[in-house]
Amino acid sequence: MMSQQDLPTLFYSGKSNSAVPIISESELQTITAEPWLEISKKGLQLEGLNFDRQGQLFLLDVFEGNIFKINPETKEIKRPFVSHKANPAAIKIHKDGRLFVCYLGDFKSTGGIFAATENGDNLQDIIEDLSTAYCIDDMVFDSKGGFYFTDFRGYSTNPLGGVYYVSPDFRTVTPIIQNISVANGIALSTDEKVLWVTETTAKRLHRIALEDDGVTIQPFGATIPYYFTGHEGPDSCCIDSDDNLYVAMYGQGRVLVFNKRGYPIGQILIPGRDEGHMLRSTHPQFIPGTNQLIICSNDIEMGGGSMLYTVNGFAKGHQSFQFQ
């Protein structure tokens, strides 16, 4: 009879040595991002990267509510204001220059969207938390000035979330898809015919083909082209001018890239991920007029700081509503 010492034994080697092993996407074109700017030596939940018409970068940290403004040329970091609403999660910029800030509230029913100047003045409730029950995580404008937003509620077996469209006058809210589990990132194709949505806790990528009215789904138009694997899941996303979709993978320290049909074509790794560092990658965004991508992440679990990283993507970023 074979002794225990002589039995076949599993060893940590290769992919099993990584804190976050990549299995199904291991054959994709893979690059590693370079550090671009340290936001804080403290672990802040960075999110919401968005550039204004002058090329200034805005972002926030969710749990403390700080709104940051960064000059990409000088790397100067300013904090123009702090959100008066709890747990802000995204910033999108209107072409009139106002910041639209999505906030999660109590993560149950007190989320909303407010607008403000870049200094935090002239506050306006766009979706107010007192009259609705949304938990709003992200939004994307269309060319008419309306926008789609994601409702972040629910969990894997209790899909309370969804995606909604708000008319350009901000008076009408129309459901697009519902009964999904923690709707998170959202992006609109260059021709505004395809809406991309990430479903975090069910680990799914939704591709929604829209009719010309922007709210009706085409026959058989709502599909799930990709299922993600691993702990946590897909977070915020953006597109480039070739309609490739860049999806940050929260808890995995990487960004996955999909073509316009939803096939994975590449991935970007955050340095230190195999050792368990900087896993909270949340949001990719292009510097306007370039193919240079900025990615935010933080190292809260390992006691590290908060960083922005950079790579070049497949194509230049899409010039969306705020640049029209």
UniProtKB/Swiss-Prot annotation:
Its EC number is 3.1.1.-. GO terms for cellular component: cytoplasm. It comes from the Bacteria. Ca(2+) 1 binds at E47, D137, N184, D235, S236. InterPro entries: 6-blade_b-propeller_TolB-like (IPR011042), SGL (IPR013658), SMP-30/CGR1_Lactonase (IPR051262). Keywords: Antibiotic resistance, Calcium, Cytoplasm, Hydrolase, Metal-binding. GO terms for molecular function: hydrolase activity; metal ion binding. It is found in: Cytoplasm. Its cofactor is Ca(2+). Binds 2 Ca(2+) ions per subunit. SUPFAM superfamilies: Calcium-dependent phosphotriesterase. GO terms for biological process: response to antibiotic. The active site is at D235 (proton donor). Exhibits lactonase activity. Acts in cells with perturbed membrane integrity and is possibly related to the membrane homeostasis. Contributes to bacitracin resistance. Belongs to the SMP-30/CGR1 family. This is Lactonase drp35. The gene is drp35.
